[in-house]
């Protein structure tokens, strides 16, 4: 096995080389991931119309809340795994993997159930109107329905990256983004499913990506993998994950609050189309922000 795929280098390799080795694939993956929103908006805007774009923009704060809980577990779990691998503690890394999976399952289910139960009030709070609520609801019902898949896929991919496979984690994102774009074209234009088609495409793409990541952790040659006895939640591990992941969690929540304030002001002074325009601009800005986020993930 080559050194570049050997997590033992986390404790021996030059820091600069490690930063490049982990950051470049992470940057490419994060930039590719930002294309999710851009591709969806391109297809939805052309096939459905501007109000659908506004409805999609309304969903951003709710998706950001979900992402906040995902980063709480993902950032904390992947960091702890990297530490354990540097210490050559494979069993400890495996326990963190199992605990991270269980936390993502639990949090993903809570967000899915609570989001679906109170979806309309939440969307109205985030700036939806009678003109846009249908589009936002149609999209989020499907996205929330697949929320557990999203959480587990992203969490496991982060751990795969930090456990010595940054390129493989990058390929996972590429698979999801490319498949999402292809399915968008089929579901939106050929089948005429509109904004629901975009949501279905996203969940299917993430399901395929989850299968890809799961295959990695079932491989006996992987340094950490699915094993018996790793899925029991341990207070020490959960506390460690939450303490490290709290910073990105708070950042995501703050970002959510900012978008809600923007949506409220834009609805008051510009109307539904102004919210849609902000959503488009925000997607483009996030494309460049992801470069910095990719660098931090590589760290």
Regions from the PLM with identified roles:
Residues 1-23, 81-148, 190-245:
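Short alpha-helical transmembrane segments in multi-pass integral membrane proteins
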Residues 17-78, 82, 243-267:
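Signature of the first transmembrane helix
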Residues 24, 28, 59-62, 69, ...:
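Hydrophobic residues within alpha-helical transmembrane segments
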Residues 27-31, 35, 39, 69, ...:
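Generic alpha-helical transmembrane segments of integral inner-membrane proteins
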Residues 28, 40-44, 56, 81, ...:
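Hydrophobic/aromatic residues within transmembrane alpha-helices of membrane transport systems
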Residues 35-54, 123-130, 186-192, 256-283, ...:
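Helix-terminus/linker motif at the lipid-water interface of multi-pass membrane proteins
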Residues 53-113, 150-169, 277-299:
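Small-residue-rich hydrophobic transmembrane alpha-helices
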Residues 74, 143-161, 169-180, 198-213, ...:
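Short runs within selected transmembrane alpha-helices of multi-pass transporters and secretion channels
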């Amino acid at each position: 096995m080559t050194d570049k795929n050997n997590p033992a280098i986390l404790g021996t390799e030059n820091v600069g080389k490690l930063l490049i080795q982990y950051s470049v694939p992470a940057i490419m993956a994060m930039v590719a991931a930002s294309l999710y929103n851009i591709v969806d908006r391109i297809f939805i805007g052309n096939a459905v119309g501007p109000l659908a774009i506004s409805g999609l923009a309304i969903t951003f704060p709710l998706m950001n809340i979900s992402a906040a809980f995902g980063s709480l577990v993902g950032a904390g779990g992947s960091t702890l795994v990297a530490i354990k691998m540097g210490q050559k503690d494979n069993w400890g890394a495996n326990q963190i993997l199992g605990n991270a999976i269980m936390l993502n399952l639990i949090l993903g289910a809570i967000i899915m159930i609570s989001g679906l139960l109170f979806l309309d009030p939440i969307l109205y709070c985030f700036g939806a109107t009678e003109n846009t609520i249908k589009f936002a609801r149609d999209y989020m019902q499907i996205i929330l329905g697949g929320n557990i898949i999203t959480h587990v896929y992203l969490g496991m991919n982060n751990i795969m990256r930090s456990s010595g496979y940054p390129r493989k984690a990058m390929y996972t994102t590429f698979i999801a983004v490319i498949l999402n774009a292809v399915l968008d074209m089929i579901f939106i234009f050929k089948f005429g499913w509109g904004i629901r088609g975009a949501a279905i495409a996203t969940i299917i793409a993430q399901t395929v990506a989850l299968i890809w990541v799961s295959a990695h952790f079932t491989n006996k040659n992987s340094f950490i993998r699915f094993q018996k006895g790793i899925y029991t939640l341990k207070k020490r591990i959960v506390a460690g994950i939450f303490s490290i992941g709290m910073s990105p969690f708070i950042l995501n929540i703050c970002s959510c609050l900012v978008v809600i304030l923007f949506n409220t002001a834009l609805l008051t002074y510009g109307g539904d189309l102004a919210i849609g325009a902000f959503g488009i601009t925000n997607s483009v800005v996030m494309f460049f922000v992801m470069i910095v986020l990719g660098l931090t993930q590589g760290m």
